[in-house]
Curated annotation (Swiss-Prot):
Protein's recorded name: Large ribosomal subunit protein uL4
Assembly: Part of the 50S ribosomal subunit.
Superkingdom in the source lineage: Bacteria
Keywords associated with the record: Ribonucleoprotein, Ribosomal protein, RNA-binding, rRNA-binding
Basic residues bias: start-end ranges: 58-70
Organism expressing this protein natively: Variovorax paradoxus (strain S110)
Gene name tied to this protein: rplD
Family: Belongs to the universal ribosomal protein uL4 family.
SUPFAM superfamilies: Ribosomal protein L4
Entry-linked Pfam families: Ribosomal_L4 (PF00573)
């Protein structure tokens, strides 16, 4: 699979031969959907919580007598039928949202995403991405010169300078291959991969 090799101005300078096992696979929409949903589900913290009828703070006194009022009988105001009462099936903080994805399925799904991005022209290769100092302004100017506004950069190695220079950039994320995830791949408009990262992606997803 031939990918565009971009220069410093963001223009296609030449072609780069990328491995077909990662960048030339057929697109499997169902598989991609499954790994994206599973990744988002596994990222949930499970911190939401609601109270049932035992946890809400209400008096246990019977609100009115059992018979003779014409109203439906009621035992206490903490009943889920009453306003301010507890929930019947409350959300609990220990709820488990995790979904299991087999390693082969995950690798195949990631390769399908990379391949589809390449076919759509949303994926390109650059020689490298390095900065001399942890300054955001020069790096932002470089991306602006390449006409990139929403981009995921997969670099072979993200050193401290590159991390500090890129972390404040809006709509720009710089990660190492091991931290590339399906949600980020489908979210950003453009994906840049360094030559060294291509080899690592081949080891991970081929």
């Amino acid at each position: 699979m031939q990918l565009e090799l971009l220069n410093e101005q963001g223009q296609a300078a030449s072609k780069y031969d990328a491995p077909e096992t990662v960048f030339g696979r057929d697109y499997n929409e169902d598989l991609v959907h499954q790994i994206v949903v599973a990744f988002q589900a596994n990222a949930r913290q499970g911190t939401r919580a609601q109270k049932d009828r035992e946890q809400v703070k209400h008096s246990t006194k019977k609100p009115f007598k059992q018979k003779g009022t014409g109203r439906a009988r009621a035992g206490m105001t903490s009943s889920p039928l009453w306003r301010g009462g507890g929930r019947i099936f409350p959300n609990m903080p220990d709820e488990n949202f995790s979904q299991k994805i087999n390693k082969k399925m995950y690798r195949a799904g990631m390769a399908a995403i990379f391949s589809q991005l390449a076919r759509e022209g949303r994926l390109a290769v650059v020689d490298s991405l390095t900065v001399d100092s942890p300054k955001t302004k020069p790096l932002a100017a470089r991306f602006k010169a390449m006409n990139l506004e929403s981009v995921l950069v997969i670099a072979e190695e993200v050193d401290e300078n590159l991390y500090l220079a890129s972390r404040n950039l809006v709509n720009i994320l710089v990660v190492e291959p091991r931290y590339a995830d399906p949600v980020s791949l489908v979210h950003y408009k453009k994906v840049l991969v360094t030559k060294g990262a291509v080899d690592k992606l081949k080891e991970m997803f081929a």
